[in-house]
Amino acid sequence: MNNFRWFWFFIKSRINWILWILFLNIILLGVAYIDYEISVESVFYIVILNVGLSILFLLFTFVKEVRLSKHFYEDKEIEEIKHKDLAETPFQQQVIDYLYRHIAAQKEKVVEQQLQIKNHEQTITEFVHDIKTPVTAMKLLIDQENDDQRKRALLFEWSRINEMLDKQLYLTRLETHHRDMYFDYISLKRMVIDEIQVTRHISQAKGIGFELDFKDEQKVYTDVKWCRMMIRQVLSNSLKYSDNSTINLSGYNIEGHVVLKIKDYGRGISKRDLPRIFDRGFTSTTDRNDTASSGMGLYLVQSVKEQLGIEVKVDSIVGKGTTFYFIFPQQNEIIERMSKVTRLSF
């Protein structure tokens, strides 16, 4: 904001005083004009001097008081404003003291809440890691099961438990995921195959197969752990809402970007629900009896995609299936985005 606009705001804030001074000077001229014993010319000179000195006083006051307003406008910290002692009037000092006390109290509350959240996240993380041990042991026991039908049923439920634990772990790490990323060129086909292996017990139990169409040399510049998490959430949704069908996964290039396409032939998503599928906790409005979904999987995808620079698009037709597109960035785009984040952090 330029100085002229600041001066205009200052004048508007002092308009009552300015009008009062002008009113008094007009009264003085009027009295001199009515009373013949008073020299109008002398009074006029006094009025001119009075107005001139008032203008100088306004300019002097503006220069002193505008500094505080500029610091507020520039969102300076209240500690900096108080340290510089910018208050020019007792009223301004009262305002600064009030803001300082209340902002300091709010900051203490924020720090306390952040500590509570951190402790809560640490507790959940430790719980998930602790429960992973018996879950892993359970897998070893299931592998020793001789009854194939019973074994498949147990592996199906074990896979669901393992997936829910992983999802909870990712949700807990979500606030600090930007500090837990390492970008490198990764084989897209390898990541997809690894995630299919993780979900194979669920797909086998539901009679779902996979068709892959990738080039071996097709690589993407990303963080392998968080990218695999995104792929897993979409695959999990496709498996959850499909039966006895096929999921097509393919990779292709378009305008210099690698695109991962995941297409299922499940129940699909209605147009009404499509804009909301990435909202936290959102579940389908078409089947209110469905309790299988927590509404957190695609929320994870939405929360991480920006840090990875991945654009996600969705097409769906109810009763015919859903298609997800992951459009991966180029390396220079990731570096540029990370440099912007670094500059903002300083």
Swiss-Prot record:
SMART domains assigned: HATPase_c
Domain of life: Bacteria
GO molecular function, one term: phosphoprotein phosphatase activity
Record localization: Cell membrane
Signal peptide boundaries: none
Domain Histidine kinase: 126-332
Keyword DNA damage included in the entry's annotation: no
Top EC group: transferase
GO process terms (BP): cellular response to phosphate starvation; response to antibiotic
A Pfam family of this chain: HATPase_c
Post-translation changes: Autophosphorylated.
EC number(s) given by UniProt: 2.7.13.3
Keywords assigned by UniProt, alphabetized: Antibiotic resistance, ATP-binding, Cell membrane, Kinase, Membrane, Nucleotide-binding, Phosphoprotein, Transferase, Transmembrane, Transmembrane helix, Two-component regulatory system, Virulence
Membrane topology summary: Multi-pass membrane protein
Residue positions where Phosphohistidine is found in the record: 129
Disulphide connectivity of cysteines: none
TM region(s), chain numbering: 15-35, 43-63
Catalytic activity: ATP + protein L-histidine = ADP + protein N-phospho-L-histidine
GO cellular component: plasma membrane
Job of this protein: Member of the two-component regulatory system GraR/GraS involved in resistance against cationic antimicrobial peptides (CAMPs). GraS probably functions as a sensor protein kinase which is autophosphorylated at a histidine residue and transfers its phosphate group to GraR.
Protein name in UniProt: Sensor histidine kinase GraS
Species classification: Bacteria, Bacillati, Bacillota, Bacilli, Bacillales
